[in-house]
């Protein structure tokens, strides 16, 4: 499971795959291209993606894919072994604890379906209650 959290819209964007390889992450970047990449005739919003130093984020293929997006996508690298600094980790924790806990999935297709359903519900809740789980900036 890979995801991005849109702080402006408070929306979680998720992609699931059976593998966790650079090609899967690059596919996710293409999804972000479609959602946030520059569009003709529109003002470009700044987009920042925060990445840990996992192998799928640091491979040659991924670095090349990130370089082609450098004109609209800024990368912030987290220090190694510091998941507490990654805000999406809290979202994953909430997703697992409140939507996926105490369930058994017979195969990955059912798990994928449950994840996407949980994300839809979480996004709807965050849209209806914008102050829920909102971090207060220091």
What are these language model-derived features?
Residues 1-44:
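Electropositive, glycine- and tryptophan-enriched low-complexity nucleic-acid-binding patches
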Residues 3-4, 10, 29, 52, ...:
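Generic structural signal for small/hydrophobic residues in well-ordered secondary structure
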Residues 12, 58-59:
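Conserved protein kinase catalytic core
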Residues 41-57, 81, 86:
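Acidic/histidine-rich, metal-coordinating catalytic segments
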Residues 62-64:
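Distinct, well-ordered alpha-helical segments
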Residues 67-87, 104:
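RNase H-like polynucleotidyl transferase catalytic core
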Residues 88-138:
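C-terminal anion-handling pockets and recognition modules
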